[in-house]
Curated annotation (Swiss-Prot):
EC number: 2.6.1.85
Pfam families per the UniProt record, alphabetical: Anth_synt_I_N, Chorismate_bind, GATase
Annotated family: In the C-terminal section; belongs to the anthranilate synthase component I family.
GO cellular component: chloroplast; cytoplasm
Record pathway: Cofactor biosynthesis; tetrahydrofolate biosynthesis; 4-aminobenzoate from chorismate: step 1/2; Antibiotic biosynthesis; candicidin biosynthesis
Name of the protein: Aminodeoxychorismate synthase, chloroplastic
Biological classification of the source: Eukaryota, Viridiplantae, Streptophyta, Embryophyta, Tracheophyta
Enzyme class: transferase
Gene3D superfamilies: 3.40.50.880, Anthranilate synthase (3.60.120.10)
Active site: 171, 306, 308
Boundaries of the annotated transit peptide in chain numbering: 1-47
Length: 902
């Protein structure tokens, strides 16, 4: 590291800004307790305490020795900031809260996050210069270009006018720094998303203690299609970092063994070109690419790569260095004036006057009372905790356990069919862990129309074409007696469900000793179009099915597949003590021992060709149109509008009389999955047969939030040898790794909105999981939920699942709405439970047959990136429809065969 260069660059920026000292006024503020409120939909409270000025022996850089006054200052202790206050500008990106988490750790307090069009310049000026609320500014990545005013918002004016405030721009923010000073923003040699490069730098303070150059260990993740043309840089902008080679790098931990490489050369027919892979990385056109700039006389820096990515090395060090730049900048300004200004500075920097800001933020925030922590058996003690309009419900849960008895009564399939399968299994549910290998899932939950607390919710978004309606939607509620009431939810379904869950009171002792997290509550689905309640302005298409359907279930049977145990649960009003329903369930289970397990109807075992599949199912899009849409996605990516777009389509087939439960039983055998599900909503003439391998989001009783996105899929091989080769091909695929990483960073962002600072982590990155028909690439992201965030806050922060949208999420969903010619409906949404104690577990609705009004539909698609081959994407989409479509056709074939024999 060139320390001289580091010192000189810091001095050059700071000293040139000393002339602006009169612009920025400082006043003496007495230390006092304060409350920091950050913006994460729910307000985040900072601990009340007096801010202290710590004294350290740190000396300002040696270039100050030339001045007698400054030399004297060198020998005096200087203040060290306990925390740094950052204004984080969000350019509608899906990685902003990864930056938020890093800054929260490094700065000692959370930054305030605002969208780039949320505050006027007058408001920004007020907080920056009149209230002196912030010490520095970070400008996030985002879709689009800095040349488009709607993409960049207020950021250009910040960069142009805030000459005396440290600013760090990331990706789009970096490009904006170049553009505002006259540099040209052009297309990169190639779009570069979710891939790694080695970086070399000039040793300036931003890269302090970070190695430089090829094989130095400084690997970074890049997400960009546009770059600053280095030839157009004005003299006031200094290049400080570049890609060190024209090569992409493999991810750490992903290695190609010699045996695999040798085998691939011998099996060219299997690998379809995989033999071309080698240890040498693919060359990038155009050579080195500019990766960082700084202003010669302002404390402004830009980074083209993403320091916040989970796969970037030294990312946290970069943010630490920016904090240090901020501290040194203000300390240097202080040292150029009178001693009394130093005292004023110390007080000013340490005690922000945040009251006006807090009031402004509070107007926008969604404040959630800390209701989740209430745990009492006394109803009277909790009446004041409910939301207005939602009466308090004190729930009592009782349960019994039948040890090692599931197999004795025919297993999960027989239990469900015998207890809930009569009368077409109407109004029944089965969250079915039909694939339990490698502990992917352990419990199955099932039930039907239950006791007095049972009800069914059905919600449809309002028709935005109705000019009298500005959002919300229509809810119908059927109770246990069949009575239906309807109401309009002005604030939408998520708000209603949130208030419902927060209105429950209970005693934790009721479920002590149970090894699972669902004890009764809501079970059902949330459709993809409810994205309209999660930040998307509107839906272009309207779903034929309800946008959400859930049961409130008060009687549940749980099967522990690991130990073969059965649990019966009954939920009732706390004012009663009835256990008759629980005893009835237990007796019905015991009676099953005398029954012969119900056999699945005989199914045809032959395979189906693509021609036969097409003859049964009609596609919403032709092969030609789907490939054209893939190319359109790649054009959007090239223009910087998205990093990755998850394009989907639907297959449909009209059905005659069909036993939907029998179809599901066939599907679960043909394609067992850990997050499978059966749902029937008879009032809606709707059945859902789901064989999903993917978890969307889970919140357990210990407040641990987990997502398990799948990105990367390949067919299983016909022989063990071929199967292993295909598995390794997926593991080493640069395209699939890039897809997966983009979604991992997106989910880290979503969890970061509602999780405790520093708790979001990735315990498993890009692992391969194998299922009946495919291998998949899966990652796991976890975090600790904040105490002031509710279960619905967590879902709303991450819905729809990023693996079904792409990134940045909001812009990607808008683009996909224009490319896709129908609503996704239930597909791409989620199925699962919301327990009355706020725990939940939700899947991603894929590999699913939706049967509605006599029509079967199957959705499928894939993530489109710059590396995608349009023809391969079409084939991958067909591959994902294979299992559910085959289940439908086999079931139809068995019906025809049975009719012919009569």
């Amino acid at each position: 590291m060139n320390s001289a260069m580091s010192s000189s660059s810091s001095f050059m920026v700071a000293s040139s800004c000393c002339q602006n000292l009169q612009t920025r006024k400082y006043f003496l503020l007495a230390p006092e307790p304060f409350e920091k409120i950050g913006m994460i939909d729910a307000l985040q409270k900072y601990n009340r305490k007096e801010r202290k000025v710590f004294i350290s022996s740190h000396l300002v850089p040696g270039h100050l020795d030339a001045s007698g006054t400054r030399k004297k200052f060198l020998h005096e202790p200087v203040p060290k900031l306990e925390f740094v206050r950052t204004l984080l500008i969000d350019n509608y990106d899906s990685y902003t809260y990864n930056i938020f988490q890093e800054l929260s750790i490094i700065n000692g307090m959370p930054p305030v996050v605002i969208r780039n069009d949320e505050w006027t310049w007058k408001e920004v000026y007020h907080y920056l210069y009149e209230e002196r609320t912030f010490d520095n500014i970070v400008i996030s990545p985002g879709p689009g270009s800095p040349t488009c005013p709607s993409d960049i918002g207020i950021c250009l004016r910040l960069l142009l006018e805030c000459i005396d405030i440290p600013i760090l721009g990331v990706c789009l923010g970096h490009q904006a720094l170049g553009y505002v000073h006259g540099a040209e923003v052009v297309h990169a040699p190639e779009p570069f998303h979710g891939r790694l490069s080695d970086i070399e730098h000039n040793g300036c303070q931003l890269f302090h203690e970070i190695p430089s150059g090829r094989s130095s260990g400084f690997k970074v993740v890049r997400y960009h299609s546009l770059v600053i043309d280095p030839k157009s840089l004005p003299k006031e902008l200094i290049p400080i970092a570049w890609t060190s080679t024209a090569e992409t790098l493999p991810f750490q931990g992903v290695k190609r063994s010699n045996s695999f490489l040798n085998a691939s050369k011998e099996n060219k027919d299997i690998f379809n070109g995989m033999s071309e892979l080698s240890d040498d990385s693919k060359d990038v056109k155009g050579g080195k690419v500019l990766m960082g700039i700084m202003h010669s006389s302002r404390p402004h820096y830009g980074l083209q790569f993403h320091p916040e990515s989970v796969a970037t090395c030294y990312g946290r060090q970069l943010f630490k260095n920016f904090r240090k730049i901020t501290e040194d900048y203000w300390l240097l300004l202080m040292s150029t004036s009178f001693n009394e200004r130093r005292a004023h500075y110390a007080a000013c920097m340490q005690v922000p006057n945040l009251d006006p800001l807090s009031r402004s933020v509070a107007k926008r925030g969604h404040l959630v009372n800390k209701l989740i922590e209430r745990r009492t058996a006394e109803v009277d003690g909790t009446l004041n905790l409910s939301h207005p309009g939602h009466s308090v419900k004190f729930l009592k849960m009782t349960w019994k356990k039948l040890d090692c008895s599931a197999s004795q009564v025919g297993g999960a399939d027989n239990i469900f069919c015998e207890l809930f399968g009569d009368q077409e299994a109407k109004n029944s549910f089965w969250l079915d862990s039909s694939s339990i290998e490698k502990e992917r899932a352990r419990f199955s939950f099932m039930g039907g129309k239950g006791g007095s607390l049972w009800k069914q919710l059905s919600f449809r978004l309002s028709n935005r074409s109705d000019r009298m309606c500005k959002g919300g939607g229509h809810l119908s509620v059927e109770d246990a007696n069949g009575h239906v009431i309807s109401k309009f939810l002005e604030d939408g379904f998520f708000d209603y469900l949130d208030k419902e869950l927060l209105s429950f009171c209970f005693d934790e002792k009721d479920y002590e000793g149970l090894p699972f997290d669902f004890y009764g509550g809501y079970i059902g689905y949330i459709g993809y179009d409810l994205k309209a309640e999660c930040g998307v302005a509107s839906n272009r298409h309207r779903s034929k099915t309800p946008d959400a359907c859930l049961f409130f279930t008060d009687n549940v049977i749980v099967i522990d597949h690991q130990y073969d145990d059965i649990y019966t649960l009954s939920l009732h009003d706390g004012s009663t003590s009835t256990t008759s329903r629980l005893e009835d369930l237990e007796q019905r289970l015991l009676n099953l021992r005398a029954f012969t397990p119900r056999r699945l109807q005989s199914q045809a075992s032959r395979g189906f060709s693509v021609v036969e599949l097409k003859s049964g199912f009609s596609a919403e899009k032709s092969r030609e149109q789907y490939i054209k849409d893939v190319e359109n996605c790649q054009e959007f990516i090239k223009e910087g509008e998205s990093y990755e777009l998850c394009l989907t389509t639907q297959m449909r087939m009209k059905l005659g009389g069909i036993d939907s439960l029998e179809l599901y039983r066939n599907l679960r055998i043909r394609n067992p999955a850990p997050y499978a599900a059966w749902l029937n909503f008879s009032r809606e003439n709707l059945s859902i047969c789901c064989s999903s391998p993917e978890r969307f989001l889970r919140l357990d009783r210990n407040a641990i939030l987990e997502a398990k996105p799948i990105k990367g899929t390949i067919a299983r091989g016909s022989t063990p040898k071929e199967d292993e080769f295909l598995k390794l091909q997926l593991e080493c695929s640069e395209k699939d790794q890039a897809e997966n990483l983009m979604i991992v960073d997106l989910l880290r962002n979503d969890l970061g909105r509602v999780c405790e600072t520093g708790s979001v982590h990735v315990p498993h990155l890009m692992e391969i999981e194998s299922y009946a028909t495919v291998h998949t690439m899966v990652s796991t992201i976890r975090g600790k939920k904040r105490s002031d965030a509710s279960a619905i806050d967590c879902v709303r922060a991450a819905f729809p699942g990023g693996s079904m949208t792409g990134a940045p999420k909001l812009r990607s969903m808008e683009l996909l709405d224009h490319l896709e010619n129908c609503s996704r409906g239930i597909y791409s949404g989620c199925i699962g439970f919301f327990s009355y104690n706020q725990a939940f577990d939700l899947n991603i609705v894929i590999r699913t047959v939706v049967i509605h009004e006599g029509e079967a539909s199957v959705g499928a698609g894939g993530a489109i990136t710059a590396l995608s081959d349009p023809n391969d994407e079409y084939e991958e989409m067909l591959l994902k429809t294979r299992a559910p479509i085959k289940a439908v056709l086999e079931h139809q074939s068995s019906i025809f065969s049975s009719d012919a024999q009569k």
